[in-house]
Amino acid sequence: MICGIDEVGRGCIFGPILSAAVVFKKKPSFIKELDDSKKLKKEKREYLSSLILENSYYAFAEISNITIEKINIHNASLLAMQTAYENLKLNCSLVLVDGKFVPKITAKNVKAIIKGDSIIDEIKAASIIAKVKRDKLMDKYDKIYPLYLLKKNKGYPTKEHKNAIKKYGVLSLHRKNFKLI
């Protein structure tokens, strides 16, 4: 079994970092449609996410902004990937993670693949379901904090988001040690 893992929200200034681990039950018919979540339109991501969830074993992990502040974004990213794999509760012969660094995963073979979210189908799938899940979380937070335009910026440091922070203040879910805050 091959597991792909990716994270989203690393460059955000609001909310958690979120990762997903994906193992396909069998080679899916939609495999050629997969791509890095950042390259797909929202509708296509959501469509593919539902197909991925139906046709794979998967797990998620969220690392809070408070933990990110304590251990830094790099370590939080690795922890998110490690935790997603642990939440999967499968023993995979090969675990492929997006990026340069290998998290502490107890599998026979773990490899970091630079640009893996554009190359490896399992990582592409993890990238898609993680992005859809985090975007939905930001949409929920937007209803609570509408002045910060989280539905639009998804927690990233856009001009509008930074202006909202200046005007309305820093929220408890903002990453306070981020240089922009």
From Swiss-Prot:
EC number: 3.1.26.4
Swiss-Prot/TrEMBL GO biological process terms: DNA replication, removal of RNA primer; mismatch repair
Chemical reaction(s) catalysed: Endonucleolytic cleavage to 5'-phosphomonoester
A GO MF term: RNA-DNA hybrid ribonuclease activity
Superkingdom, taxonomy of origin: Bacteria
Cofactor: record remark: Manganese or magnesium. Binds 1 divalent metal ion per monomer in the absence of substrate. May bind a second metal ion after substrate binding.
Stored InterPro entries: RNase_HII, RNase_HII/HIII, RNase_HII/HIII_dom, RNaseH-like_sf, RNaseH_sf
GO CC list: cytoplasm; ribonuclease H2 complex
Residue stretches making up the RNase H type-2 domain: 1-181
Compartments (UniProt record): Cytoplasm
Binding positions (a divalent metal cation): 6-7, 98
Main subcellular localisation: cytoplasm
Keyword annotations: Cytoplasm, Endonuclease, Hydrolase, Manganese, Metal-binding, Nuclease
Cofactors: Mn(2+); Mg(2+)
Keyword Cytoplasm attached: yes
PANTHER family (UniProt xref): RIBONUCLEASE H2 SUBUNIT A, RIBONUCLEASE HII
Family the entry assigns: Belongs to the RNase HII family.
Function noted in UniProt: Endonuclease that specifically degrades the RNA of RNA-DNA hybrids.
This protein's name: Ribonuclease HII
Organism: Borreliella burgdorferi (strain ATCC 35210 / DSM 4680 / CIP 102532 / B31) (Borrelia burgdorferi)
